[in-house]
């Protein structure tokens, strides 16, 4: 048997990633030098650490079931071993003794019951058994009802309305629809991005373009074996940009051909966005910097070294001005050509996970591990609203495509927040109040996305469920349970399909047409 610390560290690192502890995974990966190991992550299946621990637990349970001489232990386990039980010293001997004691008690109780039963009349005995049976049965039903998630059968999306796309060999962290056609891009821990053709005249899930992320070693292109962490289509739908844990950003054609490799970051890229004009790409990295790239030449136009810790997210305000947030709890607004931030927002007391400008570019929303959602304006230093309602970390936020300056000007502007407290909240930002709390999820919610008309909100959680909500009433209108925890949800341009990427390597497409 051979176990190396690199192997153990890699399995722990993957477990943290798969469980949604992205910041912890990043810190552990840096401290344990994961990037310097020779382990091919694409070959390691999802949930590998849990799988090997379960096998170890089964081995200990087998030990408990066998005597020292190799014969089968005649006790019967009264309950399964927990993981903590299994690592306790002398667990085999203590469990076997506990089983013997329990068996002796049961035998004594059975003998006493038999003696008592023999002295009673048969009719009375039968009546007692019937009463006990009804009581126990009712108790069982009540427990089952409590454990099940209450989702109305009428809202469940039938299997014939869900297409499951398989091909990725590891968890799929991100997905995004092409803005002009039914092409769905996905990015995975298997060091590939994929483009799936979901148009009516295609062969659906059978057509996938594999975008392999390679690095140059010894004059050859070899797989990077690093996660694809971010991707974004340009507004014309002709180019796809990807960011990777290998530190490179890449530009691909929609046909899957590599157009440019952008290399100036000194570590993993966490976020990446095209500007609306399509001439610049913005990236955020663990090296504490953000970079504006020229999409035509692949050259870095300007690097912004203002954060004191890894940059986690970026968002364009205009074609040359953007905001960035970081684990340093700060938000900087920067402009191409300026050698310092044009605005800095401070007020969060923990890592700032995501930032988003509203459709007009006037208000900036931010969410944090400090459990707050804050709204900022370039006209003042302090936040306009400090929204506190979630009781765990807020992972992401999205503005609705409604209100002034949008295609839906007569609908009210809303903001959605997704939290590790398993809830999604919809906010009226003008009044600074929560208008709906959406509570059907059972695990942390990692992604929310508004439909193009703003009438519906999709949410994806690690409980494997995608829920579709009516934004006006807060009612659940569609629900789908996949085969893995959901990392990302997104709507196509027509607003009739929702894509979702999952921890088991699957990508599902939900057809919401009647």
Curated annotation (Swiss-Prot):
Instruction: Indicate the segments forming the F-box-like domain, all copies.
Output: 41-86
Tissue specificity of this protein:
Widely expressed including the pituitary, hypothalamus, white and brown adipose tissue, muscle and liver.
Sites of the Glycyl lysine isopeptide (Lys-Gly) (interchain with G-Cter in SUMO2) crosslink? 277
Q: Does this UniProt record's set of keywords contain Aminoacyl-tRNA synthetase?
A: no
GO biological process: any one? Answer: negative regulation of transcription by RNA polymerase II
Q: Which positions bear Phosphoserine?
A: 119
Keyword vocabulary terms for this entry: Acetylation, Activator, Chromatin regulator, Disease variant, Intellectual disability, Isopeptide bond, Nucleus, Phosphoprotein, Repeat, Repressor, Transcription, Transcription regulation, Ubl conjugation, Ubl conjugation pathway, WD repeat
Question: At what positions is N6-acetyllysine found?
Answer: 102
| Compositional bias per record (Low complexity), positions renumbered to this chain | 120-135
Which GO cellular component term is one of those annotated? histone deacetylase complex
Q: Where are the WD repeats?
A: 167-206, 223-262, 264-303, 306-344, 347-386, 389-437, 440-479, 481-513
Residues bearing the modification N-acetylserine? 2
Q: Does the keyword Nucleus apply?
A: yes
In terms of superkingdom, the source organism counts as Eukaryota
Give this protein's Gene Ontology molecular function annotations.
beta-catenin binding; histone binding; transcription cis-regulatory region binding; transcription corepressor activity
Stretch list, region Disordered: 120-139
Q: Which InterPro entries match?
A: Ebi-like (IPR045183), G-protein_beta_WD-40_rep (IPR020472), LisH (IPR006594), WD40/YVTN_repeat-like_dom_sf (IPR015943), WD40_repeat_CS (IPR019775), WD40_repeat_dom_sf (IPR036322), WD40_rpt (IPR001680)
Locations listed in the record: Nucleus
Q: Which family does it belong to?
A: Belongs to the WD repeat EBI family.
Q: Which PANTHER family match?
A: F-BOX-LIKE_WD REPEAT-CONTAINING PROTEIN TBL1XR1, WD40 REPEAT PROTEIN
Disorder this protein is connected to according to its UniProt record: Pierpont syndrome: An autosomal dominant syndrome characterized by multiple congenital anomalies, global developmental delay, learning disability, palmar and plantar fat pads, and distinctive facial characteristics, especially when smiling.
What is the protein's quaternary organization? Answer: Component of the N-Cor repressor complex, at least composed of NCOR1, NCOR2, HDAC3, TBL1X, TBL1XR1, CORO2A and GPS2. Probable component of some E3 ubiquitin ligase complex. Interacts with histones H2B and H4. Interacts with MECP2; bridges interaction between MECP2 and NCOR1. Interacts with USP44.
Q: What does this protein do?
A: F-box-like protein involved in the recruitment of the ubiquitin/19S proteasome complex to nuclear receptor-regulated transcription units. Plays an essential role in transcription activation mediated by nuclear receptors. Probably acts as integral component of the N-Cor corepressor complex that mediates the recruitment of the 19S proteasome complex, leading to the subsequent proteasomal degradation of N-Cor complex, thereby allowing cofactor exchange, and transcription activation.
The text the record gives for the protein's domains is: The F-box-like domain is related to the F-box domain, and apparently displays the same function as component of ubiquitin E3 ligase complexes.
Protein's name in the database: F-box-like/WD repeat-containing protein TBL1XR1
Lineage summary: Eukaryota, Metazoa, Chordata, Craniata, Vertebrata
């Amino acid at each position: 048997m051979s176990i190396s610390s690199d192997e153990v560290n890699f399995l722990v690192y993957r477990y943290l990633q798969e469980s949604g502890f992205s910041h912890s995974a990043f810190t552990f990966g840096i401290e344990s030098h994961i990037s310097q190991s020779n382990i091919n992550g694409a070959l390691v299946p999802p949930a590998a650490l849990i799988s090997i621990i379960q096998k170890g637990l089964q081995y200990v349970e087998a030990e408990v079931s066998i005597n020292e001489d190799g014969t089968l232990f005649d006790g019967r386990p009264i309950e399964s071993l927990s993981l903590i039980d299994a690592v306790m010293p002398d667990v085999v001997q203590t469990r076997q003794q506990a089983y013997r004691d329990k068996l002796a008690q049961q035998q004594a109780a059975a003998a006493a019951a038999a003696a008592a039963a023999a002295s009673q009349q048969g009719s009375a005995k039968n009546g007692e058994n019937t009463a006990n049976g009804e009581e126990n049965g009712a108790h069982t039903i009540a427990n089952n009802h409590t454990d099940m998630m209450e989702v109305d059968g009428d809202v469940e999306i039938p299997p014939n309305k869900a297409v499951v796309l398989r091909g990725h060999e590891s968890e799929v962290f991100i997905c995004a629809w092409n803005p002009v056609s039914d092409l769905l891009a996905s990015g995975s821990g298997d060091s590939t991005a994929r483009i799936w053709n979901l148009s009516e005249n295609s062969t659906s899930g059978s057509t996938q373009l594999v975008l392999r992320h390679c690095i140059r070693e010894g004059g050859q292109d070899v797989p990077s074996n690093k996660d694809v962490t971010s991707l974004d289509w340009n507004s014309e739908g002709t180019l796809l940009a990807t960011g990777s844990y290998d530190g490179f950003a890449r530009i691909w054609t929609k046909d899957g051909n590599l157009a440019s490799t952008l290399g100036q970051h000194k570590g993993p890229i966490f976020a990446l966005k095209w500007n609306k004009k399509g001439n610049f790409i913005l990236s955020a990295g663990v090296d504490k910097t953000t970079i504006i790239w020229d999409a035509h030449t692949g050259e870095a136009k300007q690097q912004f070294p203002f954060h004191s810790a890894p940059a986690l997210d970026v968002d364009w305000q205009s074609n040359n001005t953007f905001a960035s947030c970081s684990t340093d709890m700060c938000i900087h607004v920067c402009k191409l050509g300026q050698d310092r931030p044009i605005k800095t927002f401070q007020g969060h007391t923990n890592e700032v996970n995501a930032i988003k400008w509203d459709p007009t570019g006037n208000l900036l929303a931010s969410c944090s591990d400090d459990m707050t959602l804050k709204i900022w304006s370039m006209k003042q230093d302090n936040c306009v609203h400090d929204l506190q309602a979630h009781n765990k970390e807020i992972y992401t936020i999205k503005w609705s495509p409604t209100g002034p300056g949008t295609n839906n000007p007569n609908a009210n502007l809303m903001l959605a927040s997704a939290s590790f407290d398993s809830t999604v909240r919809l906010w009226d930002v003008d009044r600074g109040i929560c208008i709906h709390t959406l509570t059907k999820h059972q695990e942390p919610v990692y992604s929310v996305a508004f439909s193009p008309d703003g009438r519906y909100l999709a949410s994806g959680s690690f409980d494997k469920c995608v829920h579709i909500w009516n934004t006006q009433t807060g009612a659940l209108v569609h629900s789908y349970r996949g085969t893995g925890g959901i990392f990302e949800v997104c709507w196509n341009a027509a607003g009739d399909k929702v894509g979702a990427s999952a921890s088991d390597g699957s990508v599902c497409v939900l057809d919401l047409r009647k």
